[in-house]
Amino acid sequence: TTLDRLNKGIKINQVEPELKIIKSAGGRLEPHVTCMVGYPWESLADAQNTVNFTKNLFKKGLISSLQATIVIPYPGTKLFAQAKKNHWLKTLDWNKYDMRQPILKSPIPDKKLMQLTRNIYLSCFTPQFIFKKLLSIRSLADIKFLFRSVRKFVGQLLDFS
């Protein structure tokens, strides 16, 4: 899997049990997950599994927030060296390394990668999530934070449309 190829030190089947442990700790812990799509070895089915997996974690209430991006191989990383060696880089224009567009060659068309990233964000925007966030309001600062979050969320959706 991608987690293995990137040496993340965790298997996909460990993610949900670990999140359950975090949630059982109580308090105000709010797990955040980052999901990336667009690896050169990733099939459309793999990427769709990432979307579905994330959506399932949200449905179960195991994550509170997420970041979805198209993978970017930054200079100095193993992925960048591997991408350079295997001719996976589409560009070396650093202005384009902002996670808003595919930089790596992928078997998945660019438009589809953008749509998948957008779908990851949309997977969290459920009635339960909105209701939970509204119930969490305790102060004016919470309301301001939620408005800023909604603005950022809409901005992310627009980035990937």
Residue ranges and their predicted role:
Residues 122-161:
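Membrane-proximal basic amphipathic "stem/tether" segments
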Residues 1-138:
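A structural motif corresponding to the C-terminal lobe/cap of the Radical SAM core domain
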